[in-house]
Amino acid sequence: MGTPLEDVTGRMPDVEIRQEAGILAPASRVQVLLALTGIILPVLALSMEEGFAISAVPRAVASLNGFNRYAWPSTSFLLTSTVAMPVFAKLSDLYGRKWFYLFSVVSSIAYPLLCGSAGTLPIPLDGMNQIILAAGFLGLAHGGIMVLSFTLVADLFPPSERGRYQGILAAVTTLPFTIGPSLGGWITDHWSWRWAFYVNVPLGVMAIAVVYFALPGTRRRLARSSIDWAGIATLLGWLVPLLLALTWVGQSSWSAPRIRALLIASAVLLPIFLLVEKYAVEPIVLLTLFRNRRITLVSLNIFLMGIGLYGISVYLPLDLQGVVGASAAKSGAVFGLYAFSVVAANLVSGRLLSRAARNQFLAIGGSGLTATGLFLLSRMDSSTTQPEILLCAILSGVGFGVLMPTYEVLVQNAAPAEAMGVATGVTQFLRSVGGAIGLALFSTMLLRIYHSHVDHLIPKGAPAPLRQAFDNPLQLAFNRPHLASAVSQIANGESLLRNLFQGSRAGFLSAMHFIFLISAAALAASCVLNLFLGGTPSQKGPRRPL
């Protein structure tokens, strides 16, 4: 027999949004706990999929002979996730969160199913293109789940309690990355890379059921409910060419015709997008939000945070293996401790946000800690030890863990209730754009700095395997036995190989200096901007019976 909160179908009933407060009402303790479970479980399932993929995707790419398209899954993910965030945010403001959240969770199930079956599906795509397609579904799911989960928390709790639960949600987002890569690697090694994807399907199915039955629906009472299709089209029109150009420039140059064409298309369509949004009835990006000085400053900070966050997340393992010479297992352990520091800081800062007199101080402290940790990473050299790198990474992780829920709460407390979804979507959107731009810059500079140290060391007429091996530095550790055989017939071959490996390490070190220094500069600029946030007290509001 169901509780009074359930309808005859066993589902939680629809509830109305109190526009003046932005919270779900009415809500008992049971309903709030069930709704919170419905919010958190999809985030956990999604993060587990992404954590396992860190170890499984490289093996899948090798198995499917797709190394020449190695970057395309990441590109597909960034494209769909970045575009999905503002679109889902706006549509959820118009028609309610639940069904768009459920659609996002269903999309997340497509990823492990498609990846696990890649190369065997009866569709007109080869195995690698099936992985790329699956990454697009993952990006769609990521964009929807990330923006809607944080918005649902803002709907469910008053401003005075949001910080605590935003911190919990941010921790759930990060926690699987402390164990996911190592567990996914173990499954890949002992079973197969396909099972590293399939193992996540049951949790995803459970998440679908919990969202459907436990998460309340919302009935929006809006005088108008038009969809900004022109805004969606022009958003895709300027953003997709920009991200493609930033992704491909590392493989060519800024003067390449296709890069120029993409950048010109993006530059032409961006002002058209802004013009469309200015006059749209229900815009995807509510430009009037940026009349609020605090939202504008926090949005800039989130963009800068995205540069540093993606920089350390992608290049810390490469730094450990390429510069310090750590094994993959030790590199994974360091990354896991870094991720754990983010989780711990999420939880602590979430509670502090509910008690702090001025959240501005948390933003200043978090950006300052992160900038310091990244700057120290930029000063390392070949004698730097793994514990020293770990200490710097943890310092950065604590800073990021403080910033994530702090920025979310600052924006949500400043935004009107009817624009809560759009405001939250803008923050997630800008973080992804910052990360995409940062990674494109870092990828380009990594290759250029690396080759400036290595190319002049390779003699003319060198065996093709030698030249090809050093054109692909990420595979050097695996190719070293074959390279020794390749240079055995060259005069001073052993000395040449030793010099090449030294040059490769020096190139990596110089590139890491650049990457972490730019990341530190972005967070230092963010710290300065945080000084101008002004008084940002933790707002009070009606409390939930928790």
Regions found by a protein language model. Give the residues of each.
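Transmembrane-helix exit segments and adjacent C-terminal regions of multi-pass membrane proteins
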Residues: 2-35, 39, 43, 473-546
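Helix-loop-helix hairpins in multi-pass membrane proteins, especially solute transporters
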Residues: 85-231, 257
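A membrane-interface helix-boundary motif in multi-pass transporters
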Residues: 189-201, 248-259, 448-520
